[in-house]
């Protein structure tokens, strides 16, 4: 497995990532404030990784969560997202893409799935924390 070190693209994305943290979508806000902010294993928002900005990132599990809105379903954006996920997975990250509607309509299920992924990736039973 490769080790990733920040590069110049990450530094270029710094201001943009900061801006995205200030202006989250309603679904990102719901996931952050309703679940991830107080999660027993640390998550961060809008993390710069490999020249990209991940919506949410758990370093301990090398887990990236991407919240996909309607614009992610255009052919051009889908191609970009697939390439981006491939690059991140090549670096050893797990990428979980979740649709806005799933967060709106199945919030508990999304949270449960994140719990399962964190436990699988870290080996830590978060139910005991």
Q: What function would you assign to each model-found segment?
A:
Residues 1-129:
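Nucleic-acid endo/exonuclease domains
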């Amino acid at each position: 497995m490769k080790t990733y070190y920040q590069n110049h693209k990450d530094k270029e994305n710094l201001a943009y990532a900061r801006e995205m943290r200030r202006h989250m979508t309603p679904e990102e806000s719901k996931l952050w404030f309703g679940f991830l902010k107080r999660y027993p294993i640390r998550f961060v928002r809008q993390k710069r990784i490999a020249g990209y900005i991940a919506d949410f990132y758990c370093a301990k599990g090398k887990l990236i969560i991407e919240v996909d809105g309607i614009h992610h379903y255009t052919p051009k954006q889908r191609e970009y997202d697939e390439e981006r996920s491939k690059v991140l997975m090549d670096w050893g990250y797990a990428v979980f893409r979740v649709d806005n509607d799933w967060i709106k309509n199945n919030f508990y299920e999304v949270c449960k799935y994140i719990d399962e992924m964190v436990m699988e990736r870290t080996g830590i039973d978060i139910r005991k924390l």
